[in-house]
Amino acid sequence: MPQSRRRLIAWVATGLLAGAVLSPAAAQTNPTVAAASDLKFALEEVAAKFERETGNKVRLVFGSSGNFYSQILQGAPFQMYMSADEEFVFKLADAGKTVDRGRLYALGRIGIMVPIGSQLKADSELKDLAAALKDGRLQKFAIANPEHAPYGARAKEALQHAGLWDAIQPKLVLGENISQTAQFATSGSTQGGVIALSLAKAESVAKLGSFALIPNDWHEPLRQRMVLLKDAPPSLRAFYNYITTPAAQDIMVRYGFAMPAVQ
């Protein structure tokens, strides 16, 4: 079986391919949380632990923070929103869609991921990426769409900092969200990409390639904020509050998130 095919099967097994959601039956009985895709592995663990401890379930739907923002403005039936960029939360609050201005729950990081067998090497300062652009080794490189995905916007900023943005644009493959971008970066369909540290930390992703963290002063911070929406049931506040408990934060830290001192 071709290596790229095996990697694709591995991604199907993780449930991280774009569009993966829970069953309609779950939507009818459990409150729905619209969560940024970088949270895929960490938040599933947090929600499972919350369920074990309280007996309460939540439905998690993962996608692009910007797309969720637009959907919520248009009346999408979400009860809680966990964005990878706090500005989307502030805009929803200004539009009267939320109960308040939310709470900062994590700080994210980005890095370069390359699949096993790639001619590209993962290094923090993107030196081999620059060399590959010059010597012709680089054909395709993945980032999330910077127009609506916060991790894509930060990838663009990092590439601009490295002086590579203009040269790399013709080579870019844009993911709809950071999960799809990670699939592109590890499946062999590209030679690598910029993905979330929180995804690279997952064992099922880490085994597909190598990863190097990009300096956090190369881009604006990924200040990730959550908020309850106006129609959130009272029971969902327990999950909202659980996100910032030590039990949940221990899981988040294990996936590479930093915990904010000021919320």
Language model segments and positions:
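Exported/periplasmic ABC-transporter solute-binding proteins
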Residues: P24-F62, G66-Q74, S83-E86, F90-T98, ...
